A protein has these predicted regions:
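Terminal, low-complexity interaction segments
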Residues: 26-35, 138, 142-214
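Conserved Ser/Thr-centered positions that define the repeating blades of beta-propeller domains
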Residues: 129-132
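Surface-exposed, low-complexity/disordered Ser/Thr/Gly/Pro/Asn-rich loops and linkers
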Residues: 54-106
Length: 242
């Protein structure tokens, strides 16, 4: 009887734990043209999946779109990336220039933010990734090293699965900003043979917010589980009566 009860309880726990166990894309920017036109120099800053906003901060500009070839975008053609520049002068604007992304995680848990980034030769070698739980105050997550010029660095990741308050949050936000070389008061160029210039470019692609849908038991499964509990109770009462 005991082994049966434990087995039934284990099954019930499994039933109520069932849900969407894989990560889903909540919001994503591929920067490809909404209507494919075969030109990588055109694109869109509207999300290709979900809803959210992406903005340039600190005076950074977007002079154009450019090829996303080399990023993780699976598009065989019409693969665009968001070209950004105007990162300021040497020694100024530390942690203040880059992009800001806002996307709700309501209905999701184990949230992850990821992006691909191409550093030009004279762009800032180091980028600081930040997150915000209220959309206003940002917390440093990690400094990433882009130590090769004219190179894509794919799947940069901010994993918030262990951060209290990131799940089911309508005010979630992220930033990727140029930062001084660690322990210094200035920027380094991605190509060690070059000198940093604010006119250097960062090109973004596959900017994504992902998460696991909050598990909700299916009605039929839940009913079956409750029926199992009722059966356990009935057998227990019958055993006591015997």
């Amino acid at each position: 009887m005991k082994s049966f009860a434990l087995s039934a309880l284990s099954t019930l726990v499994t039933v109520f734990a069932l849900g969407n166990a894989h990560a889903d894309v909540i919001t994503q920017w591929t920067f490809n043209s909404t209507t494919p036109d075969g030109a990588t120099g055109t694109g869109s800053v509207l999300p290709s999946v979900g809803t959210g906003s992406l903005s340039l901060i600190g005076g950074v500009t977007n002079p154009s779109f450019n090829s996303g070839v080399g990023s993780s975008d699976p598009a065989a053609s019409d693969n665009s990336g968001l070209q950004t520049t105007t990162y300021g002068s040497q020694g100024a604007g530390n942690n203040g220039r880059g992009i800001e992304v806002k996307a709700s995680s309501v209905g999701f848990e184990d949230v992850v933010f990821s992006y691909d980034l191409r550093h030009s030769n004279t762009s800032s070698r180091y980028e600081l990734a930040q997150y915000s739980l209220d959309g206003v105050n940002f917390i440093d997550y990690a400094v990433f090293d882009g130590g090769l010029g004219d190179t894509w660095f794919n799947a940069r990741t901010i994993d918030l699965s262990s951060i209290a308050g990131a799940d089911d949050n309508a005010n979630l936000a992220f930033r990727v900003v140029a930062t001084f070389a660690p322990g210094t008061s200035g920027y380094l160029a991605s190509d060690a043979s070059k000198t940093f210039a604010g006119s250097g470019t960062w090109r973004f692609d596959m900017v994504s917010v992902s998460g696991t849908a909050t598990p909700v038991p299916e009605p039929t499964s839940a009913a079956a589980g409750l029926a199992g509990l009722a059966a356990i109770g009935f057998l227990a009462r019958r055993r006591r009566a015997a």
